[in-house]
């Protein structure tokens, strides 16, 4: 009897563990953004790989997965880089109760990192509180700055500049 009970408990725990590891479906809007970049890469003669460019985390604490698509982590081998002078596009999609996602943030950045339960973007100049008058972008100071959820507008926004952190040397691409 005890052996049967242990077997039942083991089987139930295995089913629970499998459910915990079930793959998360990528919402249509997120997949469309990835596919658009994939097409651009192919048109330039490159080979596209999304790699680690998609993070899935509940950033706004609403119980639904949010999706962070960071183009700085995309590879477009044998073709020009998909970034520009403002860095690479970072798009955050807010997960919805029906499993879909809505774009809730889009901005250029020089990388992203999730620290705790916050998304930090590598930014520079005015976004770091710097006076940029008379400077070219190459002279701007970089920092990392978190996003925060604006529940009223249902979008992510940069948190106050007082929450910025120094730009880590490890973020060099």
Language-model segments: which ranges?
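Repeated scaffold domains used in trafficking and secretory/extracellular systems
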Residues: 106-112
């Amino acid at each position: 009897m005890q052996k049967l009970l242990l077997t039942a408990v083991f089987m139930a725990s295995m089913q629970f563990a499998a459910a915990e590891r079930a793959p998360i479906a990528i919402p249509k809007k997120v997949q469309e953004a990835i596919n658009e970049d994939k097409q651009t890469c192919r048109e330039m003669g490159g080979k596209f790989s999304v790699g680690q460019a998609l993070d899935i985390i509940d950033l706004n604490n609403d119980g639904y997965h949010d999706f962070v698509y960071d183009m700085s982590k995309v590879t477009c081998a044998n073709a020009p880089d998909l970034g520009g002078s403002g860095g690479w596009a970072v798009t955050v999609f807010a997960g919805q109760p029906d499993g879909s996602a809505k774009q809730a943030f889009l901005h250029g950045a020089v990388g992203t990192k999730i620290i705790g339960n916050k998304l930090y973007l590598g930014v520079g100049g005015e976004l770091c509180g710097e006076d940029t008058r008379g400077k070219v972008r190459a002279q701007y100071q970089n920092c990392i700055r978190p996003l925060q959820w604006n529940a009223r507008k249902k979008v992510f926004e940069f948190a106050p500049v007082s929450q910025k952190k120094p730009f880590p040397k490890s973020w060099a691409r």
